[in-house]
Amino acid sequence: MSGDQGQAGAKRPIRRALISVYDKTGLIDLARGLHEAGVDIVSTGSTAKTIADKGIPVTPVEFVTGFPEVLDGRVKTLHPHIHAGLLADTRKPEHVEALAKLGIAPFDLVVVNLYPFSETVESGASVDECVEQIDIGGPSMVRAAAKNHPSVAVVVEPNGYDGVLAAVRTGGFTLAERKILASLAFRHTAEYDVAVASWMGSTLAPEEPAQKLPAWVGGTWRRAAVLRYGENPHQQAALYRDATAWPGLAQAEQLHGKEMSYNNYTDADAAWRAAFDHEEICVAIIKHANPCGIAISSVSVADAHRKAHECDPLSAFGGVIATNSSVSVEMAETVADIFTEVIVAPAYEPGAVEILSRKKNIRILVAAQPPTTGTELRPISGGLLLQQRDALDADGDDPVNWTLATGEPADPATLANLKFAWRSCRAVKSNAIVVVADGATVGVGMGQVNRVDAARLAVQRAGDRVRGAVAASDAFFPFPDGLETLTEAGVKAIVHPGGSMRDDVVTEAAAKAGISLYLTGARHFAH
């Protein structure tokens, strides 16, 4: 055999193929094309039957192995006559001689896709049904062929079949092409193994009840888009999707506008999550991952947007808007008059997209509701952090469980505003103070390194609207100064977690100011 087969540009002819697929998409066209090109086809079980039923010559794998399919199909291809043909490096004379002595023919092409394990799990199937969909022979063939890519080409998805037929007609795949196919194949089996291992760890062999988080975490992400740049123009960036995750912003459909940027995605994700923190119709406007305004309404989504925008119109310029409701024509008319980077919603009423599209560059997204459970990952140098998602589901997130530390019990309207303020705090970077009136933020103090400055910023932004408003703090007041900043400005009721060594001093300051002060016992830091 000539040495030029080891060169990247040299092609290796395809004379013998092994095909074993669960997904039969494109199978007949592939098999017919291979046959017409003079390729001998060896196949397994239902794949062989599907090919033969169309009158295409095919050799059942048991004719090659001399051993029948057994154990309900669990053993079909796990045989030396198959794997020697996959693993023989035909660049090596000793491998070629060994095959000849054993009467084994090498394979030039392997086409395999695997049992639908993840789909079976997602369907709610029983444990036994899921176990039966753990493919053994398929990954073994794929890995063997991929390892032996100098001699074998391997294809694992139907979207690669056109490339196979093109290669067959033009003398085969080059070594460089076989390397790419091998890389794709190992990614395919890696994704499969991660799915199986994750399911095994969570279902068949879960941690002890005291261990709420797994001892091992695996995941795979596929690049979905190369972005113009990252947070800054000198940084490269791309969007990756987790095929096993709850559909989220990464899977959003873009209806109009320029391509999404890295910062668009981070802000849209923050806005999307903030909007769904509330059961009522809600609109959140985000800039640099912090709220410019959040509002709820019992009237309309347009009303919620109006109130959210009024919180901080200056900062909302060039912001990202999200709502948990369908965007109405009325809201679209208003948004179309404001420079907005992105708007994301679960749906749009007829005519709304056309109105928004008057702005050439606005990015219009449709996305599914974000998950309310699960875990979050954050990379750090040398590892990552994993935590339970803050889903506002702590006992202290329900006003029924709040403790009135001082003052008169709030009336229903005031309590509703306190609840909204408390839930809105989750979306604000710590230290966070939120001032609320009539179901809308009117002042947001975010990202300060001390709580009193967060209170001052919230009061400053609220202006005259602070009088008679309510406020929430994402963590306890360590000193009374932050609370006093709010009460002196005119805030009439405050909710905070409590738990400080100086809670009694803070409560005394609230009593002196004559306000209602509630303790939640829960905290909502966001870093």
Swiss-Prot record:
Question: Which keywords annotate this record?
Answer: Hydrolase, Multifunctional enzyme, Purine biosynthesis, Transferase
Reaction catalysed?
A: (6R)-10-formyltetrahydrofolate + 5-amino-1-(5-phospho-beta-D-ribosyl)imidazole-4-carboxamide = 5-formamido-1-(5-phospho-D-ribosyl)imidazole-4-carboxamide + (6S)-5,6,7,8-tetrahydrofolate; IMP + H2O = 5-formamido-1-(5-phospho-D-ribosyl)imidazole-4-carboxamide
EC number(s) per entry: 2.1.2.3, 3.5.4.10
Q: Which GO terms describe its biological process?
A: 'de novo' IMP biosynthetic process
Please tell me whether the keyword Hydrolase is annotated for this protein: yes
* InterPro entries xref list: AICAR_Tfase_dup_dom_sf, Cytidine_deaminase-like, MGS-like_dom, MGS-like_dom_sf, PurH-like
The positions making up the signal sequence are none
Instruction: Please give the pathway this protein is involved in.
Output: Purine metabolism; IMP biosynthesis via de novo pathway; 5-formamido-1-(5-phospho-D-ribosyl)imidazole-4-carboxamide from 5-amino-1-(5-phospho-D-ribosyl)imidazole-4-carboxamide (10-formyl THF route): step 1/1; Purine metabolism; IMP biosynthesis via de novo pathway; IMP from 5-formamido-1-(5-phospho-D-ribosyl)imidazole-4-carboxamide: step 1/1
List residues of the MGS-like domain: 8-156
Please report the name of this protein according to its UniProt entry. Answer: Bifunctional purine biosynthesis protein PurH
Q: Which organism is it from?
A: Mycobacterium sp. (strain KMS)
